[in-house]
Amino acid sequence: CRGVAVLPEGMSAERFAWLERWVTHAEDIIRTPGTESNVREIYAECEVLAKDPANQILNQFSQFENHLAHRAVTGPALSRCFERVARGRPGMTLAAFVSATGSAGTIAAGDYLKDVFGSRTVAVEALECPTLLRNGYGAHNIQGIGDKHVPLIHNVMRTDLVVGVSDQATDHLDAVFQTEVGRAYLASRRRVPEAIIAALGDFGLSAICNVLAAIKTARYLGLGPDEAVITVATDGADLYPSDRRALFARQYAEGFDAIDAAEAFGRYMLGAEGHVLELSEVDRHRIFNLGYFTWVEQLGVPLEDFEARRSQRFWRELVASLPELDARIAEMDAEVARA
């Protein structure tokens, strides 16, 4: 059994280099036209592959096991993280969980946290492609978050806010976090502790996006010091040196200096606000309905199955199927062990 990866050709060179270390055949990496937001082109390629009955398509945007895994694993893991911090902060509450939508796997942890703590669930997307915010479209460079459509596994009707983050913000803050001059600015002018500066150096573009969205959420909701916001650093900086070099060549040909670092930090971190939508019931139905055009019209999901997801009963029954899924995994593991 060979694994085949299908992803846009505009992704970083480092991402492709990482994949190349894991495949035995170069043709097992299929590059589709476009950038991060060109998801439809991936589906088209998968439709071609699916014509061969020997191929099994694993679509993280539509297979509910992705939702279940994050709800059952990521959610409790984040709960334990919060509880550990809260033990030292009596009275602390969990106000929100913030996650870029991507395939809508990680954001499923918000359902678990909402059940346990009553927290809000915040969906994040690139401002250059404001699908959830405005039914919009466009290209962007926040690699790791998909858009131009609403994933089938996204429990839209339990989402509370949507936040847009510009790829200009993530690109330029990446420059601050990854350069000596940027780190020196954070230490000397902003008094950021060295441990935090070191941690920021590990963050990739979608990780920075999530952090900015968490800041926007806290500011929009007017949260205080005892109202926590949880987010996740979903990728690493080691995936983006080529993108960073391209940014410097494009905008900082004469060098990235302390003034550039200060301007980037002031504009994109200290000025992180706006493009936040608190969802009404009408907004939720609008976003839910938008998924019709991908899943029913283009990909043939039966309308009845599509509509069933509008009710929380569907999602509760999905969670109830977890023991069956665990049994299937155990059966597969045993079969692999015998082989």
PLM segments and residue spans:
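Short glycine/serine/threonine-rich phosphate/pyrophosphate-binding segments
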Residues: 1, 12-16, 97-111, 131-132, ...
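Active-site-proximal loop->helix
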Residues: 1-48, 131-144, 148-151, 242-246
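Hydrophobic beta-strand scaffold residues
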Residues: 3, 26-29, 57, 121, ...
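Conserved acidic residues
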Residues: 27, 55-56, 92-95, 119, ...
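Active-site/ligand-binding loops adjacent to catalytic centers
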Residues: 43-44, 50-54, 113-202, 243-339
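Active-site/ligand-binding-proximal alpha/beta "capping" segment
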Residues: 49-104, 108-109, 169-204
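Glycine-rich beta-alpha junction loops
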Residues: 62-65, 101-105, 125-130, 149, ...
